[in-house]
Amino acid sequence: MEIKNYNNDIPDDYYEVMSILQDRNGTLITLDGINNEVKIRFGAVDSICDTDEGSRMETYLNGKTKELNEYRAKKFYGNPFFVATAETDFTLWLKKESWGFSEGVGHYLIITLNDIVDIASAFPPQEIIINKKKQ
């Protein structure tokens, strides 16, 4: 899987997934860092999967891209939001399961020290909200 950072505006930090909320308004993923809180809102999501990093060692430790390897080398300090640059096992699985209706969806990933969140969506995030914490 080839991935790259999706949004370079997200400040470097040590992030954890605080919540994933899905309702009729879409999907809201909240990341909590030492200095920042980031909210990523998707409108329509075809599939979302939150997995403990210990169950995703192939992705977590065997990063095949420079950006992921650098992020991992810094002990997951940085920008945790990535996008796949080609079809992945996740999007191919979704395409098969949907009988082709989910063709062309993007695969977005949030990779933190403890979680990997896979998001399949035909549309990029509607908004990314960055709140600087008061020290």
Predicted regions and their residues:
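Surface-exposed, interaction-prone regions used to assemble/regulate multi-protein complexes
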Residues: 1-135
